[in-house]
Amino acid sequence: MKIVIVLALVFFAGILAAGLFNIGLSATNEMEFCTNCHSMKIPLGEYQESLHYKNASGVRATCSDCHVPKPFVPKMIAKVMASKDVYHEILGTIDTPEKYEAYRWKMANAVWDKMRASNSRECRSCHEWDQMD
């Protein structure tokens, strides 16, 4: 009887942990999380002027659509790698427009390198290459 209770507790704890894990994943994919917790006011303004934000179709890409892989393992790797953003937020690496501009090329190259490494997987989740000019 005692083993049944322990197994039931482990089972329900596992369900709770999985639920909390999924809530955390979902929350960290929200635009508000990215733009409120990070020094991302400059890229937010640029994004809001882009076709990914405003377009005739009314479809809007969010931060996670372009920056977070859909497959589980690459997504987990991206989440772990993004922890460096917290470190740089604490340091104030890009907390002013001047610092952002000084660091922009390095950040852009890092994103382009990821795109090359994944064969633009995140772009292809929305775009059809043969329909792009």
Identify the residue ranges that each predicted region occupies.
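Short sequence/structural segments immediately N-terminal
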Residues: 1-133
